């Protein structure tokens, strides 16, 4: 793949469900009930259980890896969480990532990306710097 500034990547959709949230909670130690307990999430004004922000960001990293391959290493990564990813019971929820190469140097590439779920922007101003 030629790495050209301005090049757009094909959209990549990754899917999550309640079981993946449970497994992420176990691995991360983040057992906040807004991510696991529908009644609790609704009691604090959320529409339903929501995905962990860092899990959503990790999936953005997976999309980057899909686009550029394993030769490149992410060394800087930042995002703004614009809206939560809502995960209803018994549903697979898609998160669609889109991105572009913003800059290329001899040893670095810079990628900008965003993510939507159910038509709502969930990540914004997401930037990554990768080295070869």
Question: Could you say what each language-model-derived stretch is?
Answer:
Residues 1-51:
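Catalytic strand-loop segment that frames the active site of acyl-thioester-processing enzymes
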Residues 1-9, 89-132:
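HotDog/MaoC-like acyl-thioester-processing domains
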Residues 13-15, 80, 129-131:
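Generic structural detector for well-ordered beta-strands
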Residues 28-29, 41, 75-77, 128-129:
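Short, charged/polar low-complexity linear motifs in solvent-exposed/disordered segments
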Residues 47, 56-98:
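Hydrophobic beta-strand-centered segment that forms part of the acyl-chain substrate-binding groove
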Residues 50-56, 117-121:
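Noncatalytic linker/hinge segments flanking ATPase motor cores
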């Amino acid at each position: 793949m030629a790495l050209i500034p301005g090049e757009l990547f094909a959209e990549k959709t990754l899917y999550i469900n309640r079981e993946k949230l449970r497994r992420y909670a176990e691995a991360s130690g983040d057992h906040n009930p807004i991510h696991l307990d529908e009644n609790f999430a609704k009691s604090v004004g959320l529409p339903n259980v929501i995905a962990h922000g860092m899990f959503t960001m990790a999936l953005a990293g997976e999309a980057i890896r899909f686009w550029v391959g394993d030769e490149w290493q992410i060394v800087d990564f930042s995002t703004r969480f614009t809206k939560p990813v809502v995960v209803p019971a018994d549903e697979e929820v898609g998160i669609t990532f889109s991105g572009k190469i913003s800059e290329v140097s001899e040893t670095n590439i810079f990628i900008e990306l965003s993510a939507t779920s159910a038509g709502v922007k969930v990540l914004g101003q997401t930037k990554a710097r990768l080295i070869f």
